[in-house]
Amino acid sequence: MTKGSELLRDAGITAPELARGLGWFSLALGTMELLLPRTITGFLGMRGREGLVRLYGVREVGTGLAILGSSDPAPWMWGRVAGDALDVATVAPKLAGRKPGNVALALLTLAAVAALDVLCAEELERGR
């Protein structure tokens, strides 16, 4: 048994259940990015990047729908991991900007979600 499968077992959740939850999370986050890009860019000190945030919203919604609609969500979970890396690469340079505390909070949140995404993708692949 791997550490990841132990964590999931202790939490009382399976990898497919976690994938479904993360799929719904993608839909919610993507919807927020599509509807409230100015709020997000304002929080991060990234005004003027609303178009990019909307594009990321499309990515999140698409990935969420793919996870929820797939009989094999593992590849789509790896898509979430790639999206996490892109998000970190977009947000991290703003640590030196006007709102470093907000950016640090966003990066911590991204790291936590990325850890769940990796754990889920790995466990789904083991279960194939």
Model-predicted regions and their roles:
Residues 1-128:
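Short amphipathic, positively biased membrane-proximal segments
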